[in-house]
Amino acid sequence: MLDGKPDTFVYTGDIHAMWLRDSGAQVWPYVQLANNDAQLKEMLEGVIRRQFLCINIDPYANAFNDGPTGGNWMTDLTDMKPELHERKWEIDSLCYPLRLAYQYWKVTGDSSIFDGEWMKAITAILKTFKEQQRKDGVGPYRFQRKTERALDTLNNDGLGAPVKPVGLIVSAFRPSDDATTLQYLVPSNFFAVSSLRKAAEILTEVNKETSLAKECTDLAAEVEAALKKYATYNHPEFGTIYAFEVDGFGNHLLMDDANVPSLLALSLIHI
């Protein structure tokens, strides 16, 4: 419990840190059972509340410590804080909490989670997504790590490969925690569209925040249109397909990744 409310720290298994993606995916199968078990429901509420708290510490971070303990990656060249385990910017880190909170609300009818901490979190999510559209410069995020593994750091002085602002959202890293090659990660942009629309429904029905809800739906529509225009590729054998990554300049990376979201797994996240 934290301030009289459920608080659940879900560590990823082999590392005592809480990834926003992993924690959301780990408890997802239990949501459908929440109405049958009060303790299970309380655990799920605690995960959601902890995720909102984490986002409000730093929306660019992917993994968090259980308190300001510091960790292995405090020497990374980015804006590290002792509460952060790792600060790799991944779009899906902000989508999984929205997906979990929405489904929990739909199953249980419990809207108490959508309080002031939620409002701060969704505001931070919107701000971060818009910053990483990079329409007004490169934004505040940079990341470099002293490593022999190229996929664990970003080139271009910590900014990653250049992109052309076209309405898509940059993801510096993939759900695998590997750096993107071209920074418009297509499956994660689809996840952002779906998650923003879920957030808009919550803001409209629970918080009566129609203006903020419209910001969510407008951004979702912009990203969706950009995906249709810039993320497709005319394959000589298979016709029009979605690329895995693009950069807005016309370059496409044709592959898929094992983690979720991926192109093959879009249906698993209800897209």
List each model region and its residues.
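Low-complexity, Ser/Thr/Pro/Gly-enriched N-terminal "stalk/linker" regions
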Residues: 1-21
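A conserved active-site cap/scaffold subdomain adjacent to cofactor or substrate pockets
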Residues: 187-203, 224, 263
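Aromatic-rich carbohydrate-recognition surfaces in CAZymes
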Residues: 16-44, 48-151
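Active-site loop ensemble at the mouth of alpha/beta enzyme cores that anchors a bound cofactor
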Residues: 247-265
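Acidic, glycine-rich loop-and-beta core segments that form the ion-binding/anion-interacting portion
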Residues: 207-251
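Inter-helical turn/loop segments and adjacent helix faces that build the functional surface
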Residues: 33-38, 104-117, 179, 183, ...
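Conserved small/polar residues in nucleotide/adenosyl-binding loops
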Residues: 269-271
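Acidic/His metal-coordination segments adjacent to aromatic residues that form catalytic metal sites
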Residues: 5-10, 70-88, 150-184, 247-252
